[in-house]
Amino acid sequence: MSSGRIVQIIGAVIDVEFPRDSVPSIYDALKVQGAETTLEVQQQLGDGVVRTIAMGSTEGLKRGLDVNNTGAAISVPVGKATLGRIMDVLGNPIDEAGPIGEEERWGIHRAAPSFAEQAGGNELLETGIKVIDLVCPFAKGGKVGLFGGAGVGKTVNMMELIRNIAIEHSGYSVFAGVGERTREGNDFYHEMKDSNVLDKVALVYGQMNEPPGNRLRVALTGLTMAEKFRDEGNDVLLFVDNIYRYTLAGTEVSALLGRMPSAVGYQPTLAEEMGVLQERITSTKQGSITSIQAVYVPADDLTDPSPATTFAHLDATVVLSRDIASLGIYPAVDPLDSTSRQLDPNVIGNDHYETARGVQYVLQRYKELKDIIAILGMDELSEADKQLVNRARKIQRFLSQPFFVAEVFTGASGKYVSLKDTIAGFKGILNGDYDHLPEQAFYMVGGIEEAIEKAKKL
């Protein structure tokens, strides 16, 4: 255990001088004496000086304070003791329910599983959300991204997925709140508590108001806890909200460390940092990690370097669209932009595949006809096109669905629709079985039976 002293403080970046024969390694955790602060070594500047990032507030620190090297990376509690608890980036409890009482701690920096250890699978994960199950089905052990700008419903969709999957799925879940609103973290905790699944969830928060060090590392803390459950042979769900804030924290840290910015001001190590995180989120022969990540899209620009880098790592992408949200259709998932590797007849079967592609074809054709309708009106279309437009409008409305987590806001009770019912409903609309029903009947309902019942009342 070597000890050094603080020589410079610039915001969240602290330089510490050690004797030259005992300089800490990169990623070593250092403890400031007489303070609760933990520092993580980022650079060795030479002459025994290391540059570190503070995991927490730097208020009250001053030059000359003694700092001890722990000789290891930041470690966090893992295993069953973390379930039902809320922790910070260092694994300290923040739910005022006493110590964690863990039997084991793991370092947050770990190697990704080797190629030989990894396992792939094609088993589908049913979400109960029609548009997702139909157009961009999730794979068990896969990685999913929820892309969307500000206020189009990423967190609400994430909450609904957690409710539907975590409650229907009996395994363990880990939720990492990265740079998001504390209120949402609080809502989420109570949602889990009220649903009686809190004893199966570990919660790790590094919220918006925290220093960049916390936001940069909290995703790794959550991932480490998920890896432990996976290595014990469990199927784990890992929820990250929001992966963009992880990138943003990296940008802040990179600037403070004096690196040259690259495109749009992002850190030059953007792709590497994203890879380090994403490559660890994988399924092995022991167990699986299914991850669902919310991805904020700055200014609704999907070509921004941050979302563009994230795209490369995902098996399924759920793109939320402001245009669809403005029509009042929620969830505002864009069925033409959203993709999934599972959308393959060999994986999901011909029936599902043809229905999904049929829905996409009808919606794409409707999109093309919109210009003609806007200029010349519906009457100028051929009979076949008129029929297609009517079906497209029904499909568009049938893609909406009332959510369980939004019940308190909408007053409508939530609906869980099985994959079988979803396929049957859309197939019926495509085949013209419901051409006689008004399009309003399809808006904000669960299965197709509900639409038929609703039509009787209109």
Curated annotation (Swiss-Prot):
GO terms for cellular component: plasma membrane; proton-transporting ATP synthase complex. Its main location: membrane. Its EC number is 7.1.2.2. It is a peripheral membrane protein. Keywords: ATP synthesis, ATP-binding, Cell inner membrane, Cell membrane, CF(1), Hydrogen ion transport, Ion transport, Membrane, Nucleotide-binding, Translocase, Transport. The gene is atpD. Gene3D superfamilies: 2.40.10.170, Bovine Mitochondrial F1-atpase, Atp Synthase Beta Chain, Chain D, domain 3 (1.10.1140.10), P-loop containing nucleotide triphosphate hydrolases (3.40.50.300). F-type ATPases have 2 components, CF(1) - the catalytic core - and CF(0) - the membrane proton channel. CF(1) has five subunits: alpha(3), beta(3), gamma(1), delta(1), epsilon(1). CF(0) has three main subunits: a(1), b(2) and c(9-12). The alpha and beta chains form an alternating ring which encloses part of the gamma chain. CF(1) is attached to CF(0) by a central stalk formed by the gamma and epsilon chains, while a peripheral stalk is formed by the delta and b chains. ATP binds at G148, G149, A150, G151, V152, G153, K154, T155. This is ATP synthase subunit beta. HAMAP family: ATP_synth_beta_bact. It comes from Pseudomonas fluorescens (strain Pf0-1). SMART domains: AAA. Belongs to the ATPase alpha/beta chains family. InterPro entries: AAA+_ATPase, ATP-synt_VA_C, ATP_synth_F1_bsu, ATPase_a/bsu_AS, ATPase_alpha/beta_chains, ATPase_F1/V1/A1_a/bsu_N, ATPase_F1/V1/A1_a/bsu_N_sf, ATPase_F1/V1/A1_a/bsu_nucl-bd. Produces ATP from ADP in the presence of a proton gradient across the membrane. The catalytic sites are hosted primarily by the beta subunits. One of its GO terms (molecular function) is ATP hydrolysis activity. It is found in: Cell inner membrane. It is an enzyme of class 7 (translocase). It catalyses: ATP + H2O + 4 H(+)(in) = ADP + phosphate + 5 H(+)(out).
